Amino acid sequence: MQRIAIIDIGSNSARLVISHIYKNGAYNMVYNQKEALRLSQKVDEKNMLTEVAFSSTIETMKSFAYMCKIYQADKTIAVATAAIRNAANGAELVARVAEETGIQLHIISGNTEAYISYLGVINTINVKDGIIFDLGGGSTELILFKNRKILESVSLPIGAVNTTSMFNTRNVMPANVFSDVSFFIISRLEKYPWLKQNGLPLIGVGGTARTVAKIIQREKKYPATKIHNYSYTAQTYCSFFNRLRNTNLEQRKKISGLSSERSDIILAGSSIISCLLEATGAKKLITSGCGLREGLFFDYYSKENHVPIIAKDILKMSRENVLNLYEPDQQHSRHITHLVLSMFDAWGELHGLRKNYRRLLETAALLHDIGITINFYSHARHSAYMILNAKLFGLTHKEQVITAAIAGWHNGVSKNYFKDRFYKELLSDANWKTINKLALLLALAESLDYTETSQIHVIEPGINKKNATLKLYAQGIPSIEMHQIQEHLSWFKKTFGVELKVQLATAAEE
């Protein structure tokens, strides 16, 4: 096992993330620490970081170094962004940090920061074309990508902290000040005509983007607590921002979802997003919980493990990671996945579902047993909970709930259990009918490998004028599997309106 520490010293805050990489290539985060620094506010008239900035940064880095020691980190990757990059004495601070903590900070350029943030987004959000904005305390990185490849990028010295200081918007933002802020930002954005991409979504990275999403979720009483891949319309944003502009600092401190440490810089940060919507013509915003730190991890991981730095299929990548974390023996799960996909493909006339549901079924099948890690008893419920909360990229929030319900329901967990616990507001009655169909297919597939020996190695699902058919090819007589599948025949008839005729192939047919 290898332990990787990633440190990001930004203009507003500093972060330490420690992850484990296991021998089988699986990885997960085991520690996360955030410290507010506000370096963009600790710069004098000569563009020098003050002694207060030095002391607070060094104390934070000492704390990070101590935690790296506690977790026995094998590798530490530490970067500094806009505040230190733009300061006249940034290199001096880097030297002091190295001398007093032993950690070598690397000041990365704006273009490098943009690229690394892009890696964090493109490997975790399933969007082909879009514009990423990484809005920090002292800068905003903008990246245009199409077909998942970068076409343009730029780093602008406009952030939530330095814009707050420049226009004194810590408490309120009167109309005339907002006009000045907007003119200042738009005049800089207009220098990059490639930003005008009507129809492409804006993908937000950074604390301001996450906070805005959290506030909107609370206002809408959104049933999930996930921020990553949460999307909303530009109209929703404008309504939110118009309300926010009419608040003072004390009022904002009472807003659900807005932390007190960000309440003084949210006006400036939100103004930047408002100007980006105007400059790009975007109609939709997507929130990314992954950015610079995740990009640094993917960059390191790809080089060490000789895998593409940009995953071709992010759902498959993340699904395999979850499987490798919790399923040491994968033969059974992979075998029933093969069986259930054969049924889905052959019985399309019966289930009538779009091909998109195939990947949800595949994910549920591969991960249906991971709950055994917690306890064999009620493991279907545990599997469903783990799938619901796992870092499965490439699925919408709704798709992840459906996948979790398929995995749990196939093994007898009641529909009402999920309705009561799993964000029932996200799913319609039609969704539950779909889940029932897919859970049934998964139950059939699992019954065909009940002994987990792959005795039934090939199946031929079919449909004739009267019934659905399922011919089984096996080594020997799979008596236990033949008994188990009988228990699902009434469920099949109730769901699809036809009987399922199961036939074991003869030796001559093998």
Write out the residue ranges for each language-model feature.
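A short amphipathic beta-strand at an alpha->beta junction
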Residues: F496-E510
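Conserved phosphate-binding loops in N-terminal lobes of ATP-dependent enzymes
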Residues: Q2-E99, Q104, I185-I186
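Short, solvent-exposed amphipathic alpha-helical segments in soluble enzyme
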Residues: I21-Y22, R218-K221, Q486-S490
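Short, non-transmembrane amphipathic alpha-helical segments
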Residues: I480-E499
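Short secondary-structure junctions
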Residues: Y450-Q455, T495-V498
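Helical "lid/coupling" subdomains associated with nucleotide-phosphate turnover
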Residues: K42-M67, T81-A87, T101-I122, V127-D129, ...
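Gly/Thr-rich phosphate-binding beta-strand-loop-beta motif of the actin/hexokinase/Hsp70
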Residues: M1-N28, V121, I125-L156, G207-T211
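Short beta-strand-to-loop capping motifs
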Residues: L472-A474
